[in-house]
């Protein structure tokens, strides 16, 4: 008899709960008779809020506690933002599905300025991401970029309190939480190449639980999976965590994929860009090829310097 009850491990931020609830509703609609329960957990990344993420260090800051709950049998599956999911999974766990992607772009949010280019010289911009900091600094070295941690609501509150002239967030999180109206400008990939997997949701599960795997398999989106697989393969070859100045963005037209990648120093002084094109069927190979091209340009030295500063 198939499973009648499923427990989803989730972080407890508003966005994480929205994402888990979204998966719950989709699963219950797909499988009449199935009940789904949420298990809210607190992760290391949620607790350490006074330190820039890159300095907290380690991979999987937002997933480890969820993985432990699955391995201990307290939860059956976990819902993650794909950009937070490490490349390596603990023994016994794996990715069961990647859902259809919301926009992967970054959003410019400000109460005073309509666009990034309108920011005056020396304006204060908040972001938690070395990837965004790198690209912003390259484009606008005059800007003062400060670390901004906390969930979406907290970050918006800090902007509204006047701590920043503008902040940069993932557009997907704002849209999912009903804050589309706060987006003044969606930054193009030319201005801010997105994080690997940004905007996509992934479901992690136990590999020895074929019933749960069968239930979530129907949520898999083939195009998103191919795009994210290419981006993650690039990240994997570069040995990137989720807190490094690496960007990757795949687009699909017909059966062809274009994959763009970026590695840069956080201060924007050195930024390497490259891209590859090829068949969608070779998504992971394209990611590895792009990483090799970036490494040939010197990406390894840039990343070593970053890891050295934040180890």
Swiss-Prot record:
GO biological process, one term: protoporphyrinogen IX biosynthetic process
UniProt keyword annotation of Transferase present: yes
Keyword Transferase listed: yes
Xref: NCBIfam families: hemC
Reactions listed under catalytic activity: 4 porphobilinogen + H2O = hydroxymethylbilane + 4 NH4(+)
SUPFAM superfamilies assigned: Periplasmic binding protein-like II (SSF53850), Porphobilinogen deaminase (hydroxymethylbilane synthase), C-terminal domain (SSF54782)
Name of the featured protein: Porphobilinogen deaminase
Domain of life of the native organism: Bacteria
InterPro entries (alphabetical): HemC (IPR000860), Porphobilin_deaminase_cofac_BS (IPR022419), Porphobilin_deaminase_N (IPR022417), Porphobilinogen_deaminase_C (IPR022418), Porphobilinogen_deaminase_C_sf (IPR036803)
Keyword list, A-Z: Porphyrin biosynthesis, Transferase
Cofactor note text: Binds 1 dipyrromethane group covalently.
Recorded name of the encoding gene: hemC
Function (record text): Tetrapolymerization of the monopyrrole PBG into the hydroxymethylbilane pre-uroporphyrinogen in several discrete steps.
Modified residues (S-(dipyrrolylmethanemethyl)cysteine): 242
Pathway assigned in UniProt: Porphyrin-containing compound metabolism; protoporphyrin-IX biosynthesis; coproporphyrinogen-III from 5-aminolevulinate: step 2/4
Record GO terms (molecular function): hydroxymethylbilane synthase activity
Matches recorded under PROSITE patterns: PORPHOBILINOGEN_DEAM
A Pfam family of this chain: Porphobil_deam
Misc: The porphobilinogen subunits are added to the dipyrromethane group.
GO CC terms: cytoplasm
Record's subunit section: Monomer.
CDD domains to which the protein is assigned, alphabetical: PBP2_EcHMBS_like
């Amino acid at each position: 008899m198939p499973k009648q009850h499923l427990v989803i491990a989730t972080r407890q931020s508003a966005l994480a709960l929205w994402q888990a609830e979204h998966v719950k509703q989709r699963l219950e609609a797909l499988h009449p008779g199935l009940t789904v329960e949420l298990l809210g957990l607190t992760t290391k990344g949620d607790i350490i809020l006074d330190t820039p993420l890159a300095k907290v260090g380690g991979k999987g800051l937002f997933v480890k506690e969820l993985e432990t709950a699955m391995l201990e049998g307290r939860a059956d599956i976990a819902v993650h933002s794909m950009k937070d999911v490490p490349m390596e999974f603990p023994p016994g766990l794996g990715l069961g599905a990647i859902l259809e992607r919301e926009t992967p772009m970054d959003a410019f949010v400000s109460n005073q300025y309509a666009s990034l280019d309108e920011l005056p010289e020396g304006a204060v911009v908040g972001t938690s991401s070395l990837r965004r900091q790198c690209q912003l600094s390259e484009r606008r070295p005059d800007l003062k970029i400060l670390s901004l941690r906390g969930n979406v609501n907290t970050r918006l509150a800090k902007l509204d309190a006047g701590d920043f002239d503008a902040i940069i967030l993932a557009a997907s999180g704002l849209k999912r939480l009903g804050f589309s109206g706060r987006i003044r400008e969606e930054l193009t990939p030319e201005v801010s190449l997105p994080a690997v997997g940004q905007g996509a949701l992934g479901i992690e599960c136990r590999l020895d639980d074929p019933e749960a795997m069968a239930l979530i398999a129907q949520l898999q989106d083939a195009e998103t999976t191919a795009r994210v697989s290419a981006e993650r393969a690039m990240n994997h070859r570069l040995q990137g965590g989720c807190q490094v100045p690496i960007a990757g963005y795949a687009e699909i037209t017909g059966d062809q994929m274009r994959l763009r990648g970026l590695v840069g120093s956080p201060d924007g002084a050195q930024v390497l860009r490259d891209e590859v094109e090829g068949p969608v069927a070779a998504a992971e190979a394209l990611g590895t090829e792009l990483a090799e091209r970036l490494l040939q340009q010197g990406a390894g030295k840039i990343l070593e310097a970053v890891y050295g500063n934040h180890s």
